[in-house]
Amino acid sequence: EITNLRAILESFGAGIAAGKISQMKLSRLETLAEKMEVAAATGDKRALESITESNSEFHMVIINASGNIRLAEVIASLAHPLLIRRRFSGFAPARLQRSMAHHREIIDALRAGDNSWASAIVKSHILASQVADAGTTRLP
């Protein structure tokens, strides 16, 4: 249920953010994406902490860029770091790389100002985590 709520709410927020995100926030997203990619490349389970923190900030930068304070509050209450860390720990290396690629595509969509693309990729990105959460590492 939480994943579905996050997918709906965060995709809505990303669509709004695509039309108004600042260059400073886009730069921050780039920095966070790079930090997650470096941590993911180590293959070290301890890197999950770094990925989890950066991932949480990545998603909140987007939601905050929407300018919808209530939406940010609701999403922050749903995106508990322990749940996200557990999700990442269940990811096979290929799935983790796909998640990192999603982050790059999200940035591209936001930079393009394409609200439909941003909304769709964020929704896909969040829903893709359900496969790992269900205990399978099979790619769809």
Task: Write out the residue ranges for each language-model feature.
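Active-site loop of classical SDR/Rossmann-like NAD(P)-dependent oxidoreductases
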Residues: 95-96
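Short, charge-rich amphipathic alpha-helical segments embedded
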Residues: 125-140
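Conserved amphipathic alpha-helical segments that form helical-bundle/coiled-coil interaction surfaces
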Residues: 5-8, 12-14, 20-88, 100-109, ...
